[in-house]
């Protein structure tokens, strides 16, 4: 069957039984202005936009956050609240409950931070907190590492999608452990995996989509770019290109060269010299 780019439109991105038209999720913090954020969302048309209930100094905070929230609602993009800044299970649960009431959604991006320097998730307590939130009716998307055992444990407690990092939050380094990330994808073929944290360039996003990851979540890479709106658009294009490449079935890597032009049809003297060199 001939593959056409338009077939990506028939390749739904499904989370907890809901289909989304984009495989890009976009954070809403650290933009130069509310207008820039709004334009970036319009340029990238993400599946969801993430919002931290506990954020400090967020755009619109000077107006009590009301103007900011009204702007987000006007964008007509589903909101994914997160528990950024939470270091204990109780903080996460309290924040999630408040977010569900404020944003009127059962979706929650679970962030339980274990170290305030690396912002690495608390992998020991993360599964238990995820299980508690799921029992409370939340659709949990847990921020985690690429550790396969941890990811399996999160699935065991009821998570239907995972958000492993590529690198520590805000570093922009891309996938620092590509082997582990590719193994994770291979070992969990039926689990939606969204790369969260560490991506800095559109090429980073395209790469993980080429590996078979289902989506990416971005914030700093867009918000702190010299031209955030252009970067948002570039990431959206990279995500689509990466997914299209994955579906197209990339050629396997080889250790040795292999001529792309066949010997058949070449002048006989060239074919003879080629055979002699072989």
Curated annotation (Swiss-Prot):
InterPro entries referenced in this protein's UniProt entry, alphabetically: Aldolase_TIM, Thiazole_synthase_ThiG, ThiG
Pfam families: ThiG
Gene Ontology CC, one term: cytoplasm
EC supergroup of this enzyme: transferase
Associated pathway: Cofactor biosynthesis; thiamine diphosphate biosynthesis
Domain of life the protein comes from: Bacteria
EC number: 2.8.1.10
Major site of localization recorded for this protein: cytoplasm
Entries under CDD domains matching the protein: ThiG (cd04728)
Disulfide bonds: none
Record field: catalytic activity: [ThiS sulfur-carrier protein]-C-terminal-Gly-aminoethanethioate + 2-iminoacetate + 1-deoxy-D-xylulose 5-phosphate = [ThiS sulfur-carrier protein]-C-terminal Gly-Gly + 2-[(2R,5Z)-2-carboxy-4-methylthiazol-5(2H)-ylidene]ethyl phosphate + 2 H2O + H(+)
Any GO MF annotation of the entry: thiazole synthase activity
Subcellular compartments: Cytoplasm
Ligand binding (1-deoxy-D-xylulose 5-phosphate): 170, 197-198, 219-220
Keywords, comma-separated and alphabetical: Cytoplasm, Schiff base, Thiamine biosynthesis, Transferase
GO BP annotations listed: thiamine diphosphate biosynthetic process
Active site: 109
Function: Catalyzes the rearrangement of 1-deoxy-D-xylulose 5-phosphate (DXP) to produce the thiazole phosphate moiety of thiamine. Sulfur is provided by the thiocarboxylate moiety of the carrier protein ThiS. In vitro, sulfur can be provided by H(2)S.
Family: Belongs to the ThiG family.
HAMAP family: ThiG
Complex and partners: Homotetramer. Forms heterodimers with either ThiH or ThiS.
The protein's name: Thiazole synthase
Organism: Cupriavidus necator (strain ATCC 17699 / DSM 428 / KCTC 22496 / NCIMB 10442 / H16 / Stanier 337)
Lineage: Bacteria, Pseudomonadati, Pseudomonadota, Betaproteobacteria, Burkholderiales
Gene: thiG
């Amino acid at each position: 069957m001939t593959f056409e780019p338009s077939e990506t439109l028939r390749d739904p991105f499904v989370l907890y039984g809901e289909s989304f038209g984009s495989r890009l999720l976009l954070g809403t913090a650290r933009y130069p202005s509310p207008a820039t954020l709004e334009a970036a969302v319009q340029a990238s048309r993400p599946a969801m936009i993430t919002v931290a209930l506990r954020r400090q100094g967020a755009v619109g905070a000077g107006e009590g956050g009301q103007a900011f929230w009204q702007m987000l609602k006007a964008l007509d993009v589903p909101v994914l609240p997160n528990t950024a800044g939470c270091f204990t299970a109780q903080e996460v649960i309290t924040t999630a409950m408040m977010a569900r009431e404020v944003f009127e959604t059962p979706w929650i991006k679970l962030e339980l931070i274990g170290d305030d320097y690396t912002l690495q998730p608390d992998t020991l307590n993360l599964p238990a907190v995820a299980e508690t939130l799921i029992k409370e009716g939340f659709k949990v998307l847990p921020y985690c590492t690429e550790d396969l055992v941890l990811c399996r444990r999160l699935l065991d407690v009821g998570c239907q999608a995972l958000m492993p990092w590529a690198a520590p939050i805000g570093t922009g380094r891309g996938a620092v452990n590509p082997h582990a990330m590719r193994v994770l994808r291979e070992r969990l073929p039926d689990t939606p995996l969204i790369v969260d944290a560490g991506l800095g360039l559109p090429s980073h996003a395209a790469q993980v989509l080429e590996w078979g990851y289902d989506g990416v979540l971005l914030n700093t890479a867009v918000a702190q770019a010299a031209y955030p709106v252009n970067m948002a658009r570039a990431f959206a294009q990279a995500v689509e290109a990466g997914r299209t490449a994955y579906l197209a079935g990339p050629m396997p890597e080889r250790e040795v060269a292999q001529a792309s032009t066949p010997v058949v049809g070449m002048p006989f003297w060239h074919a003879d010299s080629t055979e002699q060199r072989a």
